[in-house]
Amino acid sequence: MAFWRNRHESPAISQERSPSPDRFQNSEDIREDNNNYNEDEKLGWFASFMGMFSLPYDWYLSINEDIAVIDWDSKSNSVAWPLGNVLTFLFFSVRLLQDNVIAPNINKLTHSDDAFDFSKSKNLQKYDYFQQYGGSASSSENLYYKMLRQLHRLFYLLTVLLLITNISVTYRYLFAHFQTYSIFYWKTVPKSKNVTKKSLHDLNHTYVEDAKRDSLWGMIKYLLFNGSHDDETNRAHYYELRKWTPSRFLTSFFVSFSPIAFCFLWMTDVTFKTLIPIIIHQYVLWFIVIDRYEQKLKDEQILSMSSVAELNSKVIQPKMNVLKQDAMVDATPYNDGIVYFYPAYTTTRSHVFATHTLSGKLSKEKYNPRTDSFEDANSQRTENYVRFSYHHPKSINGAYVRESYPSRQHSPRLSPSRYSHLQSGNTPSAPSTPLLIPSQQPHFDHSMLANASRNHNISERRNSHSPIKQHFANRLLNYPDETNDSIPDVSDDRFRMDDRFRRGRQGYFNRSPDINSGTLHYDDGDDDDNRISKSPFRNSSSSPFR
């Protein structure tokens, strides 16, 4: 993996082209001398803002972006449900006025009644007798019928608009919202009418939907060459599930503006008594679909999420997050007793990233926190510290090093008994070696008392009855080498204990044994209490748990 930085460097300006007071005295002279100066640059921010909406397509994109960022599901109860009820009762009001006001006067509103209008006859207008009744025919069409005629047209237009809205909402709710899922690991045939069986061979070829978008010649080629498949290719199949997934906003809108109520109001004579079944219909449909069915889906989602959480906490997390600790012990025949403990995956985690160049060549890069960039990693020689690894206390990430205790390590010439590890168990929290098995409790426990043997700040090891100790009790004495192959003990002055103190571990500077007496010499003072408190051994522990 590689990170790239884009550095924008402005070109250097030469002294000849750099502006100076001697060359240019007035900015207006610059604009006059520049033939490429555009007058449009004088426009301010308002003209730039209006330029974004210069075309109708820009308005279309802007409106669609504003609509797309709205969370419509959160507005299902506040917008969709009231809006659907308003449209339903608006159509009820329109049908009520049509059946009780417009319908009785429909003949006067739609048919012309001037077939026998004598006032339009030129022959009859010559007589004075007919002139006195000429204004009576025109006065019959008063303002009331004009208003009814306009209302009739308005109600007809509202009915058409509400019908189109109801049809579009119903179609989008029932047929427009589907999600397709591919099922590859299902052995039996799923019992659902929304599941179709498809061949895996079709995944490598053009789908029918893609062929429909192609040209006429492309569709002909698909029908001729890709229409039939061999039986062998149809054996490998998968299932495709087409799931119906309407949104919450559309569901609330469909329930409140139901096509059932719309058809009922359209096909019956509406009176004030019709309002009662409409209200009952709205409440029952809301109670079944919104209050019961959607709540059932939410409850099933909660149960599935709880099952996944239980599986994650009981199976996945214990398998993925196992308590581990890295350790490195001395596996050489010298038996120096060197043990290194690290946090988990300290030695296996690498900061080197392997990438490939455009030509396909392998490239290894390492992140350098000092320069905040990636550098090419050079292959270095691997060094194995076989002996005297305490010379390198910070060789691997500054890990904690447990020094070799003479009271716990055996002589290079001695080997432990085969019965020394029969009574001890393995610690459940940290790795250990056969030479460094701590004293165990009767049962494994992760409490503070059970792990006190691994924490020197709480309690150091005291009079232990470990079977390992009785075999290695003479580690303090230097036996003569009979085979002339043994290696003398290394002086403990070569240990660097400064790092031990900084890491919170107790240490000691001089623990060289006395060959004659088998005791240890301390350079910290002659005080008995001071000597006891600084001793790292279990026999002289001053732990409060003792």
From Swiss-Prot:
It is a multi-pass membrane protein. Residues 1-10, 25-35 have a biased composition (Basic and acidic residues). Its main location: nucleus. The keyword Transmembrane applies. The keyword Transmembrane applies. The chain crosses the membrane at residues 155-175, 249-269. It is found in: Nucleus membrane. This is Nuclear rim protein 1. It comes from Kluyveromyces lactis (strain ATCC 8585 / CBS 2359 / DSM 70799 / NBRC 1267 / NRRL Y-1140 / WM37).
